[in-house]
Amino acid sequence: MNLVDKFICEIDKGLKFSMDNYQKQSRDYPAKDLPEDNLNETERSHSASLMRVNHSGEVAAQGLYRGQALTARLEGTRDKMDRAAQEELDHLSWCNKRLDELNERPSFLSPLWYGLSFGMGAVSYTHLTLPTIAE
């Protein structure tokens, strides 16, 4: 696949991660065995606001890792960025699940967070030639 095709695929992923209610995970939801929340409206609203910020961070992490993976020159670096992005998908899924539990939505700015982070990741790795990333 050429660079343009890869870039188009990444745009598609970005839209899915930032707009869809992504809930596919490889690890169990950490709150699955916790009792039902008995939050009043103020607590629920505050919790949802905090979770929306957390969700935005997870969307941005996807963009950063995906951008770095796209432009990394070394295959090992690309693999590590792909693996990091894959691990972060669980966090994104958990944030979506919690927002659903709180009857809330993610930020409308999620596509912007993804796009800006993707751009930063792509630009940062275009010029780096480090042999490995610290583990």
Regions found by a protein language model. Name each.
Residues M1-H55:
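Terminal targeting/low-complexity segments that flank the catalytic cores of oxidoreductases
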Residues Y29-H46, A61-K80:
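Helix-loop segments that flank and shape redox-cofactor active sites
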Residues S45-S56, E75-D90:
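Alpha-helical scaffold segments that form or flank carboxylate-/histidine-based iron centers
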Residues Q62, A69, D79-P111:
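Conserved alpha-helical segments that form or flank metal/cofactor-binding pockets of metalloenzymes
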Residues L112-F118:
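Short, conserved phosphate-binding/catalytic loop or strand-edge motifs used
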Residues T126-T132:
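Conserved small/polar residues in nucleotide/adenosyl-binding loops
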